[in-house]
Amino acid sequence: MNKDIATPIRTKEILKKYGFSFKKSLGQNFLIDTNILNRIVDHAEVTEKTGVIEIGPGIGALTEQLAKRAKKVVAFEIDQRLLPILKDTLSPYENVTVIHQDVLKADVKSVIEEQFQDCDEIMVVANLPYYVTTPIIMKLLEEHLPLKGIVVMLQKEVAERMAADPSSKEYGSLSIAVQFYTEAKTVMIVPKTVFVPQPNVDSAVIRLILRDGPAVDVENESFFFQLIKASFAQRRKTLLNNLVNNLPEGKAQKSTIEQVLEETNIDGKRRGESLSIEEFAALSNGLYKALF
């Protein structure tokens, strides 16, 4: 029996056999530690009833561990050079489908409908390329896909921002966007030494469990996120200054903004990072009614 793909020796053999060279532009860093891969699968609670979407399978190291436990794995791979490698390394597993496509351009909902009809739940599990982590996660959340959750490895700093609490250094618009849709928790720190090539920073695994509905009720989701973006536009400025300077028509509506801040008992001298998601929702709803 061949060793697992993720063992350093097997990874080296595969890369040598295909003369594969890493593309920095695609953020390719392959994991060479089977124990860590298995812990990721554990955190995703993958069972024989789970359908799994993987993004960026590389040479199939995580895919293999997922395939051993899941009912079905569908992996999106953007790099054409990896397709013959994946066909080879994953040949023992009949429950794996590789799609050669950029997941950001893919109709993921249709893929789910076609591929996972006989699965009880769907998880996204992946070692995401650093350079597109946030766009991928926001696409998965904003498209309201029928997912149970998302368990992904990403840059440690980004994971900390996603799971951050108000008033912390890491808390910002990304924290609120992710926590609006999910319950977020960093479940593992992964040292940079277990990758080839070795990245410059450590990684973390974050678990995002989809909420039944948004964390807070908002009158208009689009305006809510517009308000969040404006509130964090310049972190050192007060909330009032940020809203006046960064909301469309903010300057013309300064008195309205001040009035709504007063009505919602939010001090305009505070900074955006001190507001909870509930306070942002109250402010968003008040402003939306007053402005539109």
UniProtKB/Swiss-Prot annotation:
- Report, from the record, the phenotype seen after gene disruption: No visible phenotype. Not essential.
Q: What class of enzyme is it?
A: transferase
State the Pfam families in the record: RrnaAD (PF00398)
- Where is this protein found? Cytoplasm
Q: Name one GO cellular component term.
A: cytosol
Q: Per UniProt, where does S-adenosyl-L-methionine bind?
A: N29, L31, G56, E77, D102, N127
Name the InterPro entries on file.
KsgA/Erm, rRNA_Ade_diMease-like_C, rRNA_Ade_Mease_Trfase_CS, rRNA_Ade_methylase_Trfase_N, rRNA_adenine_dimethylase, SAM-dependent_MTases_sf
User: What molecular function terms (GO) are annotated for this protein?
Assistant: 16S rRNA (adenine(1518)-N(6)/adenine(1519)-N(6))-dimethyltransferase activity; RNA binding; rRNA (adenine-N6,N6-)-dimethyltransferase activity
GO aspect biological process, one term: rRNA methylation
UniProt keyword annotations, A-Z: Cytoplasm, Methyltransferase, RNA-binding, rRNA processing, S-adenosyl-L-methionine, Transferase
Principal subcellular localization: cytoplasm
- The EC code for this enzyme is 2.1.1.182
Q: Which family does it belong to?
A: Belongs to the class I-like SAM-binding methyltransferase superfamily. rRNA adenine N(6)-methyltransferase family. RsmA subfamily.
- Function text: Specifically dimethylates two adjacent adenosines (A1518 and A1519) in the loop of a conserved hairpin near the 3'-end of 16S rRNA in the 30S particle. May play a critical role in biogenesis of 30S subunits.
Q: What is this protein called?
A: Ribosomal RNA small subunit methyltransferase A
The record lists the organism as Bacillus subtilis (strain 168)
